[in-house]
Structures are given as C-alpha cells and as structure tokens.
Swiss-Prot record:
Note: Reaction proceeds by a ping-pong mechanism involving intermediate methylation of a conserved cysteine residue.
Species for this entry: Nitrobacter winogradskyi (strain ATCC 25391 / DSM 10237 / CIP 104748 / NCIMB 11846 / Nb-255)
Domain Radical SAM core: 126-369
Residues holding S-adenosyl-L-methionine: 198-199, 230, 252-254, 329
UniProt protein name: Dual-specificity RNA methyltransferase RlmN
Disulfide bonds: 133-372
PROSITE patterns reported for this sequence: RADICAL_SAM
Length: 397
C-alpha cells in the first residue's frame, strides 16, 4: 500500500492481468535473466543473452526475435515459444497543425468481457528537442477540477512495460531507432515528461522501474536530466522519488492558498501546501542546476492576480525553482476560462523580477486535445464498432 492511500500494484478499481505469453519489455536485467532461466537457458549464458536482448530491444527497437541476427536460430525459436516483444497497440494517430502527434494506445484489459483499456501519449517536436508526454495510469483518481483527464475514472495502473512501451511506440512511429546508418545519430525523442494520464507517484514502483530502463545508457539512453516526473503532490513519495529514481521533478501547484488548491487539486486536502513545500525542500536531487519546476495553470479570475504572484514568490523562498505558467487549455464541459494574455504577462513579469524563471508555456496540440490538461481516453465511451473503425484508421497510416 502506498503511503498516499492507493496501492502501488493494484488500484482501487482494477488490476492488471498478465497475458499467457508475456512481453520482455519493462523487465529489469535481473528479471529478464529469471525469465530466461524459466525457459531453460543455461546459467553461464544468461548474462550474455540478456545483453544481446537488451541491445536489440532498446537500441535497435526490434519488434520480433527474427530480427536479432546475433542470436542463434535455436535461441530465437525458444524465445518465440515463451515470450514476446509486444508493445501497446496504436489505435489511432492524430497530427496537429503545429506538428504535435497524439497516439491512442490500446492495452490488455485482462478480461475478454471488458472494453480494451486505452491511454494517450503525445509527441511535441521543437527546434532543439522532441518531448514525449507519457501516461502512468488508465484514467486518474485525483479529480482536479480544471483537468480533462480528471473526468475519467481510474481504471488501473500501468505496468513498467506499458510505460516503457509508450517510448518504444513513439520511436517506432517516428522511425527513431538506431540503425547501421545512424548508430549514434540524433534522436527525435530526446526528452520524457511523466505528465500524461494519471498520477505517477500513485504508481510508484512501475514508474520507477520503467524510468530506470529508459535512462539506462546501454539501451534507450535518455539522461535523467531530460526526464521529468510531474506530481500533484503525493508528499510521502516525493523524497523517495529523488532517492530511487533521481529524475527532474515538477509539481502541479496551480494555487497558493489551501482553500483554492483544495478545490483545484483535491489531493491538497490530504497533503496541504506547507507539507508539499517541505517535501520539495527535502528533494535530494534538487540543486541550482536541477531546479524543481512548479506548474501553474492560468485561470481567469481564479488564480491569476498579482496578489497570487506575490504569494507564489513568497511560497517558493529557499527552493531551487522555476515556474511554468500554463495558459488554460479548454475542453468540452469545463467551467474555467484562460486568463487574458495581458494578465499572464503581468504575472510572469512579477515572478521573473523576483528572481525566478517564469516562461509561459506555448500551447501545443490544442486542435487535437493533446495540450496540457486535455488528455482523455475518449474510446472508453465508444462502441465495439467505433473502436474497430479507429483501429482500421491507424492501420492505414
């Protein structure tokens, strides 16, 4: 049981039921060696075989064992009998006018009678980087009032393999794997943000295990300084994340008064602002070079006054911090509006003059509901025929 009140491997709603023939994706080296032992690979070969598999899976992006030409034919046949390299299935892809891509990914439900479980993953290309926004849960339990994902019930946690699988799907779709022509070439996916569907720190073990695989420099190899974990404030797991994962930290703050944050981010009722700020001060990976990002969505007439800006500066005193100001991205049925641009600039200027970096995030992918706070698995509501139509669309891409 997580200290925040939600089990780490089993949610209050549903559980993950592994397939009869499991995927190797998401296993640590030790777990992969155990899997090889279970299918009869001799002890003296396991370390070498794990290294071979790791390279083919996470450097070359192999989708089948047949591609692994440095592995013996007999070994490939044995692997094919017992395990897979399956990643999430792309159900649909949308491409924004600004180049942002959103993938709807299908996951095993664990029950043939259930609708397939689906999450969304977003790729945001920029001139100097390519950022992938990754989900940690199917749905969300936090019910943040301004967030579209919060209107979808929590279904279950993702596994480490499903988290790593999102990065692999993105590299598949973008043709972003190393090959003979580009063994060390620039990659399109350079940064990872755990800012998709779900609260990462309510799925701590899977998020930790997945991100450590993503950061492994003998595989996918994305530096921990290019990976950001965003939390709404699961205080007991914040310091633990710094100790066991060591990536960059972002806090979904959005308010500087408990009474307002209780409404915007209901988790605040359990872990109020003072406790959250202390956890940030204690975060072991924070420094002037590795500042904590505080995300602050700009809501017209709600949290965007200069008094709010003054309180924010006072609140962050003594924390290595930067502030991301996020223009609110509307979604169907919301009661909030985005702050006027003039007010956003005044807020940003006040925070900047107080000594904090305060960039205003450029909205990306709004036209395909891929921007911050807009993600939701709309197919949770679709009929089987409609889901089949979406899958057919994806296969023709």
């Amino acid at each position: 049981m997580a200290e925040g009140g939600v089990p780490l491997e089993k949610t209050a709603i549903g559980t993950y039921v592994p397939p009869a023939k499991p995927s190797l994706i998401g296993l640590s080296r030790a777990e992969m060696a155990e899997r090889l032992a279970a299918i009869g690979i001799p002890r003296e070969q396991r370390r070498m075989r794990v290294q071979q598999l790791w390279h083919w899976m996470y450097v070359r992006g192999a989708r089948t064992f047949a591609e692994m030409t440095s592995v013996s034919k007999d070994m490939r046949a044995e692997l094919e009998k017992h395990v897979t390299l399956d990643r999430p299935e792309v159900v649909a892809e949308q491409i924004s006018s600004d180049g942002t891509r959103k993938w709807l990914l299908r996951l095993p439900s664990g029950d043939d009678l259930e609708k397939p479980h689906e999450v969304e993953c977003v790729y945001i290309p920029e001139t100097d980087r390519g950022t992938l926004c990754v989900s940690s849960q199917v749905g969300c339990t936090l019910n943040c009032s301004f967030c579209h994902t919060g209107t979808q019930r929590l279904v279950r946690n993702l596994t480490a393999g499903e988290i790593v699988g999102q990065i692999m799907v993105a590299r598949d779709r973008l043709n972003d794997w190393a090959d003979r022509e580009t063994p060390h070439g620039n990659r399109l996916v350079t940064n990872i943000v755990m800012m998709g569907m779900g609260e990462p720190l309510y799925n701590f073990d899977a998020v930790r295990d997945g991100l450590l695989i993503v950061a492994d420099n003998e595989g996918i190899g994305i530096s921990k300084r290019r990976i950001t974990l965003s939390t709404s404030g699961v205080v007991p797991n914040i310091v633990r994340a710094g100790e066991e994962i060591g990536v960059m930290l972002a806090i979904s703050l959005h308010a500087v008064r408990d009474e307002l944050r209780d409404e915007l981010v209901p988790l605040n009722r359990k872990y109020p602002i003072a406790e959250l700020m202390q956890a940030c001060r204690d975060y072991p990976a924070a420094s002037n070079a590795k500042r904590i990002t505080f995300e602050y969505v700009m809501l017209k007439g709600v949290n965007d006054s200069l008094d709010d800006a003054r309180r924010l500066v006072k609140l962050l005193n003594g924390i290595h911090a930067k502030i991301n100001l996020i223009p609110f991205n509307p979604w169907p049925g919301t009661r909030y509006e985005c702050s006027d641009w003039d007010q956003i600039e005044k807020f940003s200027e006040y925070v900047f003059n107080a000594g904090y970096s305060s960039p205003v995030r450029t909205p990306r992918g709004r036209d395909i509901l891929a921007a911050c706070g807009q993600l939701k698995s709309e197919t949770e509501k679709l009929s089987a025929r409609e889901r089949q139509a979406l899958r057919a669309m994806a296969m023709t891409d």
